[in-house]
Amino acid sequence: MSIINATTLKEIINSTLEHNINIKAISIENKAQQKAFEGVENIYNPTATVGANYSQLDLDMREVQVGNTGTAFLKLGMTLYDGGKNQAIKDQKNFEYHAGVYDTDTAKKELILQVVTLFYQIKTVGDTIKVFQDKGKTLKAQYERVQTQYNIKMTTVDEVLKLQSEYETNQYTIAELKYQESSLIRNISLLANQKINKFDYSTLPDVKNLTLQESTEIEALKMNILAKGETIKIASSVNKPQVKLENSLNLYGYSDYNNNILTDLPTTQNQLMVSLTYNLYDTTSKKRIEVAQLEKLASEERLNFRREEEKMNFDLAKQKLNTQLLKLNSLKSAVQMGKSVYEIITIKYQNGIVDNITYLDALSKKIFNEALYKQALNNYEIAKANYYFNSGVDYKSVLKKW
C-alpha cells in the first residue's frame, strides 16, 4: 500500500476513485460485459466451416466399393429467420452492459459517501481528542495547585485524590479516542488503497434546494427489466419457424477401387439447402417463458419499491439536514453558556467558595458541550453529502462543486 499526503476531502475522494480495489473489480466486470455484447454484435453474419475426413474399408470389399475415400468440404450458412432469437440476444447483452455501467456509477457514489462519512468521523474524533487534551491540561494544573495546598495542610487528601482520579479517567478517554481514530483512519486507507497521513478540515458547499432525480440504481434496474424482456423473447423464439440457408462445396479423392467399374465417381459436389423447421410441441419452452415472465414481474415490483424508497430517503435526508442545522445553532449557544459558567465556577473554586465536585461538574459540562458542538459540525457536513446524493444528482457534477 503506497503512501499519499492527501489533505483535503476532495483529494482523498479522487485518490479513492482511482485506486479502490472494488471499483477496479467492477470496471473489469464492465469490460467483460462489453466483450459479451461485442461478441453478439455481428450475430447475423454468415458462418463458414471447413473440414476434412478420410475413410478406409478393409476385408470383404465388393467390386462396387471404394477402399479409401478422402473428403474436404467448405460449408457456408446463414440464418434467414430464427423467431427473433438472435436480435433478442443482442439487445439483452446491450441492456446488461448498460446496467453494469449504471451499477458502477452507483458503487462510486456509495464509495464517496463512505469516504465522506469516515473523513468527518475522523475529524470528530480528532476534535474530541483535542478537547479532552485541553481538559487534561486544566485538570493537571488544578491537581498541581491542590497538591501544593495539601502539602502545606491547606486542603484535604480527598480533594487531591478526586482531581487525580478525574485526570486519570480523562487520560483513558483520550487513549480510547485515539484507538477509534486509528481504526477509522485504517478503514478510509483501505477504501483509498493508500495510506493517508494527514486530514485537513474541509467543508462542503451549502446545499441549495434540490429536486429528486432518478438515480443510477433506478436506471440500472430499468436496464435489467429490459434485459429480462429479451429473455422472454429468446425463450419464445423456439416456438416460431426457423429458416436456414446452407451451401456446401465438397471435394473427393479415391484410391483402392475398381476403376473399370467405378468410372463416374464425383470429385466435386456443391449442395444448396434451404431448411424450414417448426416446433409443434415443447413443454419445456413454455415453462422457460413463464419463469422469465415471473422474473421480469419481480424486477418491476423491485423497481417500484426502490422508487418509493428513494423518495423517502430524499425527504428524510432533507429533514436531517435541517435538523442538524438547528442542533448546531443550539449547541453553539450551549458552548457559550458552558464556557461562561465554567469561568465563574473556576474563580469561585479557586477562592474556596465552591467544592471540587461543583468545579468538576462545570468543567465536564463545558467539555461535553464543546465535544458535541464539534461532532455536530462534522455531522452537518455528512448530512449535506447525504442530501446531495439522495437527490439522485450525478456524483461527477457534485465533485466539481466540492
What is the predicted role of each segment?
Residues 2-7, 11, 108-219, 223-226, ...:
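Periplasmic alpha-helical coiled-coil/stalk elements that build and connect Gram-negative outer-membrane
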Residues 156-158, 353-375:
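Short terminal targeting/anchoring segments
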Residues 5, 372-402:
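Acidic, low-complexity, intrinsically disordered peripheral segments
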Residues 26, 48-52, 93, 243-247, ...:
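Membrane-embedded beta-strand positions of outer-membrane beta-barrel proteins
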Residues 150-154, 349-353, 390:
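A short glycine-centered flexible hinge/capping loop motif at secondary-structure junctions
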Residues 17-24, 31-46, 74-92, 102-109, ...:
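A glycine-/polar-enriched beta->alpha junction
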Residues 51-80, 89, 246-281, 400-402:
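Small/polar, glycine/serine/threonine/aspartate-rich low-complexity segments that form flexible
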